[in-house]
């Protein structure tokens, strides 16, 4: 009986972890699971105002490209938009927006997107938040040669290899940046945030194109922290622009916020339910600093 209970617990934790790190794995949710996550999102009161685009038009692409190019090198921005356009040209018929429009929450038809993507790309699942963020930042941040823990990056690395997204050197740097970080068995976010600050302090970040990370706590195989979602925040004419790829299947989003704090609130409310019993709630990092509310 004890053995069976242990196996059940491992199975539940595995399912929870795959849901928790939303852009870590290709998501094949049941309709019931999707409805549950949507209902959680709908129950959250929105504390921010924003407009968004999936960059599915030339004007929106050029606007976002200009904002990114002001703080990032041309090669990285070009490589990023190659990924954006490949995705949008493949699945853009699934109600992806061009012009910026009012943004509260989005709900995409993952099944339709997958049915468009897979016939063209086979077993290449596409790219996620971490891959795209690294694509933008790789030439403007300094990543030290550290021992890496890429145990939760197996799908990311498989996608990188099958899509020939990065070479060996970039893949190694990617694994270091998004390594799993050891922590303690506590629900105290302050403890985990200090661990993450210590780890990320070893990197030299871009002060203008800022890496905003949602860090999640996992206890499946020891106590650890992991960047479950990430995107890039840059200044724009009207405030700030946040660029993200939601999951392997789900689209790119460029979101305009009036303030950095509004972007922090967006990430905090979107991922606040991605936790479990005995685990700390997710928290936000701005480059190497914990964002406290």
Regions found by a protein language model. Name each.
Residues 2-11:
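Bacterial N-terminal signal peptides that target proteins for export
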Residues 72-218, 222-227, 235, 239-250:
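Acidic/His-rich structured neighborhood in mature extracellular/periplasmic domains
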Residues 30-82:
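N-terminal mature-domain "stem" immediately C-terminal to a signal peptide or N-terminal signal-anchor/transmembrane
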Residues 250-260:
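A short, polar/proline- and glycine-enriched secondary-structure boundary/capping micro-motif
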Residues 242-245, 258-293:
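Low-complexity, Gly/Ser/Thr/Pro-rich intrinsically disordered linker/tail segments
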Residues 24-26:
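Bacterial signal peptide processing site
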Residues 20-22:
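C-terminal motif of bacterial Sec signal peptides marking the signal peptidase cleavage site
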